[in-house]
């Protein structure tokens, strides 16, 4: 149940290898299901990042996406049989906007390369629903949950706990240390 419109822009459009086209098709199917469930409050579109922008604006836009976690992948595509390969950039990500806030989803996060073999496609497709639902839940939440960690008795913060806090918890929760001394 969404109180306002959620706008989703997916950056999977244009001339791409078949693995990315399959990912785009799966993403569109999922977003169509979300639209049906969310009534008129889910809107989505597919676009080629920076299309129609001047070079400077396009570089600024791509830099903004990279800072949000959507990084371009440079891939080799065969132009025509016997003519060799051409390098292209593909940005497998989405930008979700809601009430003046925005968040980004890297559809290939967790993947080591942009080589779209069957295993990578299946893994990426399996995580699509979670990634979009999680991002929509985060961006539409009114408050961010708070976690407190008790410190005291001369104990130091272990590297495992520090890694957990920085790597996982800070992206989803507010975090505070509570001294018990």
Predicted features by range, described:
Residues 1-181:
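Short, surface-exposed patches at the edges or C-terminal ends of soluble domains, predominantly
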């Amino acid at each position: 149940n969404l109180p306002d419109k959620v706008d989703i822009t997916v950056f999977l459009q244009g001339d791409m290898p078949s693995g990315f086209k399959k990912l785009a098709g799966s993403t569109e199917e999922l977003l169509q299901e979300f639209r049906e469930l969310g009534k008129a409050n889910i809107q989505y579109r597919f676009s080629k990042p920076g299309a129609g922008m001047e070079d400077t604006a396009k570089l600024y836009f791509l830099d903004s996406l990279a800072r949000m976690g959507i990084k371009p992948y440079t891939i080799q595509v065969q132009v025509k049989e016997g003519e060799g390969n051409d390098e292209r950039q593909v940005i497998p990500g989405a930008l979700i906007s809601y009430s003046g806030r925005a968040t980004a989803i890297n559809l290939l996060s967790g993947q080591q390369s942009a080589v779209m073999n069957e295993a990578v496609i299946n893994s990426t497709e399996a995580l699509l629903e979670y990634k979009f639902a999680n991002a929509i839940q985060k961006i539409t939440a009114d408050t961010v949950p708070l976690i407190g960690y008790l410190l005291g008795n001369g104990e130091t913060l272990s590297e495992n706990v520090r890694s957990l806090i920085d790597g996982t918890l800070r992206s989803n929760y507010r975090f505070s240390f509570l001294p018990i001394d």
